[in-house]
């Protein structure tokens, strides 16, 4: 695209338009000249694409070129209207317990008010269960009819897709669905409800509200099996698993009491339910040679049956009837496309041939194990439905689906832009000018500028050499670091030494060689070879930082952290996986950046190759430097979201 087709969007000095506690009433749009215009009404649910569309009526996203645009999500937009009218009706036809809970959550005099996006996500799941699935006709004419809902639950095309489809170029074989069917057609499909929620908008509280709704209703009417009395919370790693223990009602630090989720009169009903929090690694099939947690050559139990799997993973929950599943960071929990339907090939993970954000064979294996485990639970114990929570519920390149396509079972959407406009997250700032004299600032598309400036001698295996990247990016790095230093000084002057938690800067690199060079430049920490007793050995040297002394590492203190992605992944696997002491120390440091009194308290800069792992909930990130391509909405939201808490 030419520069004329992609104008730099003008800064919005006051981007917050809405209250976080009410439905958005305004939103920003950009015209073709890149100027922000305030638009009345709520932003329609949509996703951005590069070339191919998978929704209904394609809408041109103003201000960008012909190979980029936005497509609407018709199921979400229609459900928004229906849920709003149901809300205004006083939640007609809901149970008395549900009405009591929804009124409690919506009270304006709450000490900790709940965000509108949290309540709406829960309302949508409740509406689907208590109204549409139960066949209760509301007094208003719904945009999603009961017949539409039944079609969605059978994998059939709902009538409204035909009504909304006005662009002949949209794929006719793609439409919303609320089921996820296994490749083996003899198995029952999973019912899935996807809720897109921006990073920092409170997914854990949404899970707590859904558990409360299910347990209180089931506790009040034991025979009402629409409501589960057992919940499995599936998560991506050990760090998230540890943090989500607050969803267990019996814990002293539970969220139900801390955030006043359950009215006191209903609190005893919570004790009748059971919550299990588990990371997906436990869904991996057990070896036939394992007995009692140990491996034996002479033991061969055969392939693990769904019943044995359920008993191992769920324990006594396996006997408690159909369960509700909450998938946290659910963009990992997808079913790879069948071989005959794949639009892209699977790749191995190497810096040379795998683009950032492209699924590799390990990602595919993780998704297969996660969803395969849910299939086994559904076969044996039964799953009422899954609620998938994610800030980025889109398919990656390499999964066999169109890159960036949304999961088809999304039912609610409150994305990053909505969260910014509602004041829920920090306000990001992008470079919009510099002193180069060029129409576009170099820092705005830094990686693209670096690649364009590279000659053949500056490249190796098709990518810029690390030293060339540092040379080209030094000005941008210095600028961001100067802003970080100013914030660091402000924080240090405003707080006592005991209470001081430093701001953190993130540098996300294209490959390990670039990451290592930037780490050495920022931290001053390098590996050198020395001669000792006639032998050469490596030792660590601590020199000056190329930026500020406040980022310099010393033998007894680490301020700049280089994340070893492989080592961190091993640690996050948790029980049942090989885990070194060093890997566990790294996990604890990364998981507690910005947390006073914790191992990561003093970290000031993080250098990594891949996106930082889920569960990295630091709220002290102030700068992010991206030194690699960010080619999709998913990647931008994932990386930028790390700095907006």
Residue positions per predicted region:
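Interdomain helical connector at the RecA1-RecA2 junction of SF1/SF2 helicase-like NTPases
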Residues: 25, 29, 33-34, 40-41, ...
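Conserved Walker A/P-loop ATP-binding site and its immediately adjacent core
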Residues: 206, 224-255, 281-282, 510-515
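A short beta-strand element within the Helicase C-terminal
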Residues: 611-629, 637-640
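Conserved RecA-like ASCE ATPase "motif II neighborhood" in helicase/translocase motors
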Residues: 275-326, 333-376, 584-595, 608-609
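Conserved pre-motif I regulatory segment
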Residues: 86-196
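Conserved C-terminal RecA-like helicase domain
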Residues: 99, 112, 136-145, 149, ...
